């Protein structure tokens, strides 16, 4: 018999004080060795993107951001309290740099699997989707030009990649909130297109299907926990996550 629970109170080890220490531990290393899970690799892409300036994320900001999607009022309070940090994290030049790097990185891994991109908030999800779409089209255009000058063998592989990029679909997956149309209009964004897609299609099933062309999703809170996707190979984080929120 095994008992498990999510350690929510990291600063106050109340479970250990109440029930005592662990009887046994089945850690991540053993799970990988047993084949129960796959290895996890972390790469700091931020250090490789030129002119990418990340604001200092303190524990206080981290706690606030982690709970930012509970309700609209709390999110408004967060954005007012940490306006400078959030402004830096969501500035267009920064988001564009990340979007361009994402397109280059993920398109190079086109034979691996699907990708999930975690953004700071809902508006940023849609903005990042738009930026990625722009650079994705540019990459397709560059790929077509490259095929023209490639050898026959190189061209065959590049054409396979081109077909994959042209077939790849992306989606924004965020929860609905009151007055969201007006909220997104302030940023000159149309949420109706994305909301219709979320309501009329079973995006969760499509994303879990390795043969389905829905290969990239942009999220900020949904699908981060309790959502298993065996064909997911890359998780791109541009939102501070920690503890159970990160590992689940």
Regions found by a protein language model. Give the residues of each.
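Conserved helicase ATPase motor motifs in RecA-like P-loop NTPase domains
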Residues: 1-12, 35, 117
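A short beta-strand element within the Helicase C-terminal
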Residues: 215-219, 223-242, 246-247
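Conserved nucleotide-binding/hydrolysis micro-motifs of P-loop NTPases
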Residues: 6-10, 33, 46-50, 122-124, ...
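Interdomain helical connector at the RecA1-RecA2 junction of SF1/SF2 helicase-like NTPases
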Residues: 12-114, 128-134, 140-150
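Conserved C-terminal RecA-like helicase domain
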Residues: 79-216
């Amino acid at each position: 018999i095994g008992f498990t629970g999510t350690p929510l109170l990291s600063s106050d080890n109340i479970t250990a004080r109440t029930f005592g220490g662990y009887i046994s531990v089945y850690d991540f290393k053993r799970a990988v060795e047993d084949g129960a899970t796959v290895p996890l690799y972390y790469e700091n892409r931020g250090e490789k993107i030129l002119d990418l300036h990340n604001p200092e994320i303190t524990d206080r900001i981290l706690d606030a951001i982690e709970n930012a999607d509970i309700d609209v009022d709390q999110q408004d309070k967060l954005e007012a309290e940490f306006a400078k940090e959030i402004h830096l994290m969501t500035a267009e030049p920064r988001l564009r740099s990340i979007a361009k790097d994402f397109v280059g990185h993920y398109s190079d891994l086109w034979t691996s699997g699907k990708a999930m991109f975690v953004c700071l908030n809902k508006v940023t999800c849609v903005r990042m989707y738009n930026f990625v779409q722009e650079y994705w089209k540019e990459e397709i255009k560059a790929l077509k030009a490259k095929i023209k000058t490639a050898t026959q063998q190189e061209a065959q592989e590049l054409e396979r990649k081109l077909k994959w990029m042209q077939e790849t679909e992306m989606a924004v997956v965020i929860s609905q909130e009151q007055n969201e149309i007006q909220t997104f209009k302030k940023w000159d964004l149309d949420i109706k297109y994305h909301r219709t897609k979320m309501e009329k299609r079973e995006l969760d099933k499509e994303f879990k299907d390795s043969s389905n062309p829905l290969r990239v999703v942009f999220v900020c809170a949904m699908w981060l926990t309790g959502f298993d996707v065996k064909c997911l190979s890359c998780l791109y984080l541009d939102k501070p996550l920690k503890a159970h929120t990160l590992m689940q």
